[in-house]
Curated annotation (Swiss-Prot):
Keywords: Amyloid, Cell membrane, Copper, Disulfide bond, Glycoprotein, Golgi apparatus, GPI-anchor, Lipoprotein, Membrane, Metal-binding, Prion, Repeat, Signal, Zinc. GO terms for biological process: protein homooligomerization. It comes from Saimiri sciureus. The normal, monomeric form has a mainly alpha-helical structure. The disease-associated, protease-resistant form forms amyloid fibrils containing a cross-beta spine, formed by a steric zipper of superposed beta-strands. Disease mutations may favor intermolecular contacts via short beta strands, and may thereby trigger oligomerization. It comes from the Eukaryota. Residues 26-112 are annotated as: Disordered. This is Major prion protein. The gene is PRNP. Its main location: membrane.
Length: 260
């Protein structure tokens, strides 16, 4: 790992050195190094706007074709199409779309921003279910094809599998000492929640249903455990990689080149 980090450091130093030097070189010339300027910023010999208030053909400061300070086509200071100082579409001083100005629009409270970090964490680990003490609801799964040892139960399962859970409730794998504890807890909570929810809708389960649900949910909880264990291992490996000294040194050097 240390050798890999050192080689990566050498490669990026060679790649970014020229870029860092080029960013610090002064560039010749620039915009507005001479020529016309706005009033009050003039330089000797530079062009300036005329000091008198009138525009072309206006004796008293008006716009084009306006004798008394109005905008285009307005005799008394109004905006375009407004005779008395109003904004666009307002005859008496209102802002755009409002008769009393636009300042009230800027006093509205801003909408709260969504915390993207929390959203990303919920999407990666599953949605936390309120009222279940930290349990999360896994993504939907296809119900496994299970054989129960006799034709009657196999046929009953195929005909009623849609009534059984397609998602399981679970806690993070790091809260359990082994897979069996995770699966046992996952099965109990999932069946209890599904039974209570379904019973409130007026549907009851027989002993055969409960027996089949236990087998189905057990397989789904095992699948969920394998998925969560793999994700937990990958997160741990990433933390080890980015905490190694060569990688930290490399990242610090890149930040220095970009910012400096």
């Amino acid at each position: 790992m240390a050798n890999l980090g050192c080689w990566m450091l050498v490669l990026f130093v060679a790649t970014w050195s020229d870029l860092g030097l080029c960013k610090k070189r002064p560039k010749p010339g620039g915009w507005n190094t001479g020529g016309s300027r706005y009033p009050g910023q003039g330089s000797p010999g530079g062009n300036r706007y005329p000091p008198q208030g009138g525009g072309w053909g206006q004796p008293h400061g008006g716009g084009w074709g306006q004798p008394h300070g109005g905008g285009w086509g307005q005799p008394h200071g109004g905006g375009w199409g407004q005779p008395h100082g109003g904004g666009w579409g307002q005859p008496h001083g209102g802002g755009w779309g409002q008769g009393g100005g636009t300042h009230n629009q800027w006093n509205k409270p801003s909408k709260p921003k969504t915390n993207m970090k929390h959203m990303a964490g919920a999407a990666a680990a599953g949605a936390v279910v309120g009222g279940l003490g930290g349990y999360m609801l896994g993504s939907a799964m296809s119900r496994p094809l299970i054989h129960f040892g006799n034709d009657y139960e196999d046929r009953y399962y195929r005909e009623n599998m849609y009534r059984y859970p397609s998602q399981v409730y679970y806690r993070p794998v790091d809260q359990y000492s082994n897979q069996n504890n995770f699966v046992h807890d996952c099965v109990n909570v999932t069946i209890k929640q599904h039974t209570v929810t379904t019973t409130t809708k007026g549907e009851n389960f027989t002993e055969t249903d409960v027996k089949m649900m236990e087998r189905v949910v057990e397989q789904m909880c095992i699948t969920q455990y394998e998925k969560e264990s793999q994700a937990y291992y990958q997160r741990g490996s990433s933390m080890v990689l980015f905490s190694s000294p060569p990688v930290i040194l490399l990242i610090s050097f890149l930040i220095f080149l970009i910012v400096g």
